[in-house]
UniProtKB/Swiss-Prot annotation:
Protein name per UniProt: Probable glycerol-3-phosphate acyltransferase 2
CDD domains named in the record: LPLAT
GO CC entries: membrane
Organism whose genome encodes this protein: Arabidopsis thaliana
Keyword entries, A-Z: Acyltransferase, Lipid biosynthesis, Lipid metabolism, Membrane, Phospholipid biosynthesis, Phospholipid metabolism, Transferase, Transmembrane, Transmembrane helix
Pfam families: Acyltransferase (PF01553), HAD_RAM2_N (PF23270)
Molecular function as annotated in GO: glycerol-3-phosphate 2-O-acyltransferase activity; glycerol-3-phosphate O-acyltransferase activity
Length: 530
């Protein structure tokens, strides 16, 4: 009997020993082959040129933890108003889902049915929003690395141009999208494919350069943490508290300056901003219609006060131009301005209270041409014909010309065409700047007929018009008889460009209309005649 008790006791002890001791020993974590460090430890490295930095875009580069604004940009710009409203309505439910499920849902809502060939949001619109969300401290660390590898859960088409072209990241590993017949299905490839692509990149890096691999990710990214731990000797983790203390990357420190960008949205579409935008839309439609009707039909003495009352701010700065503006002249004045929106000539007319002004344009929609209260004439891009047309218009009154040939939203001036310097003795440079809150009044790939309407949809748009000191044209008596008159034309055009740039604090460039449209729309910007 006592022997049975002893055997039973031994069995119980052996069971407990196996269950608690051996089980714990067998399932304990293996010794880690990497070091876990806080992200601020990276700043202690004096030289990272012999290291390959592998970082998670959402967790370690961008300040914001929310991906909603980027998918809202895709939904609004590529899918339209209804799709973006649908995404906003479903966002409360998406926020309750897991990270992976919420991401897949937003991809489905934003990309389903979008044609691949016409999708240019990732190249022309999204880089602006991503750049405005980059943390300065982390960017400075990445800039010191010998090679940078970006890993992201976002679709490759959303992040590739932003990382490669604007941040000069050598390798970008994102998730591919499934397609049928050239249309996106709104379904991203499984994470296993992302891991396979990442594994291939890392193996090539190991065999090719032999650099030490350092991983940078977030505490909130367990999938990337396990992925990095397989290959990296060191892993640095970014906390949310670290991100809150980061500064935003300034524009003057962009590796490649952001000169051109497209899209209608001028505000970052966070959930709150998007909700405010849709709540404002009904009032904006009524306000824009009132501004359009009364602004075009009332005399300037009544139109200007009404537009100011409706929220449009117009500022005019004039330096002793009364002799040019008010005096009777045989020929009109040539006002040469930089190009911000299609409304530039109209606001010069409003500012000077002169309704008999005329404007020449390189491209203008039929609707805008019909609605314009001042006469507009299209240029043919034939130098002789355009010069004759401008001289004829000057004989009839004042003329406004935008020699850039297209608009630019950022503080840069495109190259000025020298044609204007040949048609008038006295040129009045005009520096123009405009600001909006919700919508841009320009587009490269959208419908240009809606440009003025989108500008008027803003609650408080503003225009600043500065008349600068007059400049002598190449047709003046001082320039006649010069052997190389073509060189004088370019010198006058460059001088006017620099005067306007200095007045606005803008940087002068040699970029042209063709450069802009090749980047934003994939064409050379020439409007086909119908």
């Amino acid at each position: 009997m006592s022997g049975n008790k002893i055997s039973t006791l031994q069995a119980l002890v052996f069971f407990l020993y196996r269950f608690f001791i051996l089980r714990r020993w067998c399932h304990r974590s293996p010794k880690q082959k990497y070091q876990k460090c806080p992200s601020h430890g990276l700043h202690q490295y004096q030289d990272l040129s012999n290291h390959t930095l592998i970082f998670n875009v959402e967790g370690a580069l961008l300040k914001s933890n929310s991906l909603f604004p980027y998918f809202m940009v895709v939904a609004f710009e590529a899918g339209g108003v209804i799709r973006s409203l649908f995404l906003l309505v479903l966002y409360p439910f998406i926020s309750l889902m897991s990270y992976e499920m919420g991401l897949k849902t937003m991809v489905m809502l934003s990309f389903f049915g979008v044609k691949k060939e016409s999708f240019r949001v990732g190249k022309s619109v999204l880089p602006k929003y991503f750049l405005e969300d980059v943390g300065l401290e982390m960017f400075q660390v990445l800039k010191r690395g010998g090679k940078r590898v970006a890993v992201s859960d976002l679709p490759q088409v959303m992040i590739d141009v932003f990382l490669r072209d604007y941040l000069e990241i050598e390798v970008v590993v994102g998730r591919d999208m499934k397609m049928v017949g050239g249309y996106y299905l709104g379904i991203v490839e499984d994470k296993k494919n992302l891991e396979i692509a990442f594994d291939k990149v890392v193996q090539e890096e190991r065999l090719g350069s032999g650099r030490r691999l350092i991983g940078i990710t977030s505490f909130n990214s367990p999938s990337h943490r396990s992925l990095f731990s397989q290959f990296c000797q060191e892993i640095y983790f970014v906390r949310n508290s670290d991100k809150k203390s980061w500064q935003t990357l300034p524009q003057d420190q962009y590796p490649k300056p952001l000169i051109f960008h497209d899209g209608r949205l001028a505000v970052k579409p966070t959930p709150l901003n998007t909700l405010v935008l849709f709540m404002w839309a009904p009032f904006a439609a009524v306000l824009a219609a009132a501004r359009l009707v009364f602004g075009l039909n009332l005399p300037y003495s009544l139109a200007n006060p009404f537009l100011a009352f409706s929220g449009i701010h117009l500022t005019l700065t004039v330096n002793n131009h009364n002799d040019l503006i008010s005096a009777d002249r045989k020929r009109g004045c040539l006002f040469v301005c930089n190009h911000r929106t299609l409304l530039d000539p109209l606001y010069i007319s409003y500012a000077l209270r002169k309704k008999n002004m005329k404007a020449v344009t390189y491209s203008l929609s039929r609707l805008s041409e019909l609605l314009a209260p001042i006469k507009t004439v299209r240029l043919t891009r034939d130098r002789v014909k355009d010069g004759q047309a401008m001289e004829k218009l000057l004989s009839q009154g004042d003329l406004v010309v935008c020699p850039e040939g297209t608009t630019c939203r950022e503080p840069y001036l495109l190259r000025f065409s020298p044609l204007f310097s040949e048609v008038c003795d006295v040129i009045v440079p005009v520096a123009i700047d405009s600001h909006v809150t919700f919508f841009y009044g320009t587009t490269a790939s959208g419908l240009k007929a809606f440009d003025p309407i989108f500008f008027l949809l803003n609650p408080f748009p503003s225009y600043t018009v500065k008349l600068l000191d007059p400049v002598s044209g190449s047709s003046s008596s001082t320039c006649r008889g010069v052997p190389d008159n073509g060189k004088v034309n370019f010198e006058v055009a460059n001088h006017v460009q620099h005067e306007i740039g200095n007045a606005l604090g803008f940087e002068c460039t040699n970029l042209t209309r063709r450069d802009k449209y090749l980047i934003l729309a994939g064409n050379n910007g020439v409007v086909k005649k119908k």
